Swiss-Prot record:
NCBIfam families: S15_bact. Pfam families: Ribosomal_S15. This is Small ribosomal subunit protein uS15c. Its main location: plastid. The keyword Ribosomal protein applies. InterPro entries: Ribosomal_uS15, Ribosomal_uS15_bac-type, uS15_NS1_RNA-bd_sf. One of its GO terms (biological process) is translation. Keywords: Chloroplast, Plastid, Ribonucleoprotein, Ribosomal protein. Part of the 30S ribosomal subunit. It comes from Ceratophyllum demersum. One of its GO terms (molecular function) is structural constituent of ribosome. CDD domains: Ribosomal_S15p_S13e.
Length: 91
C-alpha cells in the first residue's frame, strides 16, 4: 500500500493548508489502517489483540462517518464513494 495515497483523495488546492484534523482525512487514515489490519488477520487468525484493535478502529470510523453524515450529507456521500465503503445499515 502506498503511504502517500491520500493525495488523490484530498483535492490539490487543499494541500497547502494542513488537513490532518479534517473528518475526511481521519476517516481515510482509519480506512487504511483497517485494510492493513484485515490483510494481517487473514494470515494470523488468532491474533486477538489485533482483532480488538480492528474493532476499536472500526467503531471510531463509524462514529466519524455518523457525525459527517449528520453535518454534511454531500461530503459524506462523496467520501464513501471515493473510499469504496459501504453505507452502514440504519437501525
Amino acid at each position: 500500500m502506498i503511504k502517500n495515497s491520500f493525495i488523490s483523495v484530498i483535492p490539490q488546492e487543499d494541500k497547502k493548508r494542513k488537513r490532518g484534523g479534517s473528518v475526511e482525512f481521519q476517516v481515510f487514515n482509519f480506512t487504511n489502517k483497517i485494510r492493513i489490519l484485515t490483510s494481517h488477520l487473514e494470515l494470523h487468525r488468532k491474533d486477538y489483540s489485533s482483532q480488538r484493535g480492528l474493532r476499536k478502529i472500526l467503531g471510531k470510523r463509524q462514529r466519524l462517518l455518523a457525525y459527517l453524515s449528520k453535518k454534511n450529507r454531500v461530503r459524506y456521500k462523496e467520501l464513501i464513494g471515493q473510499l469504496d465503503i459501504r453505507e452502514p445499515k440504519t437501525r
